[in-house]
Amino acid sequence: MSIRFLKRLRAPLYIQNAYCSKNYFYRSFIQYYSPSNGPYLKISMNKAPQSLGLCTARGDSPTNQDRMAYGYLNNLKDTTNRDSPFFYGLFDGHGGTECSEFLSTNLGKIIENQDLNDTEKILKEVHSVGGYMAGLKPPFSLRTVLQSRDEDLLWRARLYYSFLQADMDYLTNYARPSPDSAVPGAVGTVAIITSKNNLSYWESDSYIIHLAHVGDTRALLCDSRTGRAHRLTFQHHPADVEEARRLRRYNMGFSRDSFGQKRFAWVANTRSFGDGYKLKKLGVVAEPQLTSIHSLRDDWSFLTLLSDGITDVVSDDEVVDIIKLSESPQDAANNIIRYAQNVGAVDDITCLVVRLPGWKKRTINDFTKNLRLEKSAYHPRRS
């Protein structure tokens, strides 16, 4: 395994159905052999609680601006002999639902259809925005990517350019004819899971998780052997040293809000989709953090994607303990939402739980039981 470990009042008491991309429902299923060596049995993912858990709830705002999407990237199977890669995405909107809705509907298709031979066109459009964007340089050369047979590099490039293209496509549709005006934006995390053979990742002895991330959503893995949480993403925030260094090369638009939190321009996140061309020129880009994790079958019990409405009030260890003590991924997602509401979540809260091959091997130890009891007892709204 290779992985980068990072050290880094009031919500309605009900649970809404998950908002998911309808475009992926028709191809979102698990295949089972039934009977042995017989025909495939296909079960829709949103009706497979033992494999995928989805739950979301509105915060204090009038509408829930979080969105989720999942499904096979079927077009990519045409170029390989392997099972289709699977796509999971969580998008946390702000200023409206337009951007998170756009991403849940379109980002999977953009990733699926991304032609790396056309990336110069994407960069040309990005550079035409001006300001910070005019000097944006990919973390890898196009020539290296086109000549490479390294699947990790090819996936990182596909995700990198897909995030940039989605950002430009959204702004083209929503930021005209007033290009300098603010428009709704979103942050998000996408996980692509592939296997190294022609089996689905849940049947394979080894698999790879490719992650792309902007903003303050979060991805966690649970180690099957130790039961511990491993964070895969970090928050793109003005307080982050690397982000502050990146932005200070071009401007000094840092300030603090009334709570003492560091902000850049008028936003809390230094990377996001949408938000208007003016912020793009200042450096609030959709350039993603990219991570690839090579895993053996029993390494990880589950992957979870979370919006910051949860992580603001629930620690990583609490999240992982609640999930691993649940009977199924769907029960786990429901339990996370209920607990976040119980301990004072005020923002929209969304949880997506993906069962990984090590689910049955997970270590059932509860490191945060006392902490959760104390927090639940302290908060006036307790279940």
UniProtKB/Swiss-Prot annotation:
Q: InterPro entries, alphabetically?
A: PP2C (IPR015655), PP2C_BS (IPR000222), PPM-type-like_dom_sf (IPR036457), PPM-type_phosphatase-like_dom (IPR001932)
* Entry-linked Gene3D superfamilies: PPM-type phosphatase domain
- Sequence positions that bind Mn(2+) 1: 92
Please give, as recorded in its UniProt entry, the membrane topology of this protein.
Answer: Peripheral membrane protein
In its keyword annotation, does this UniProt entry include Magnesium? yes
Task: Write down the required cofactor(s).
Answer: Mg(2+); Mn(2+)
Q: Name one GO cellular component term.
A: fungal-type vacuole membrane
Checking SMART domains in the record gives: PP2Cc
Q: Where does the UniProt annotation locate this protein?
A: Vacuole membrane
This protein's assembly is summarised as: Monomer.
Protein name as catalogued: Protein phosphatase 2C homolog 4
Q: Which organism is it from?
A: Schizosaccharomyces pombe (strain 972 / ATCC 24843)
Q: What is the lineage of its organism?
A: Eukaryota, Fungi, Dikarya, Ascomycota, Taphrinomycotina
Task: Give the gene symbol.
Answer: ptc4
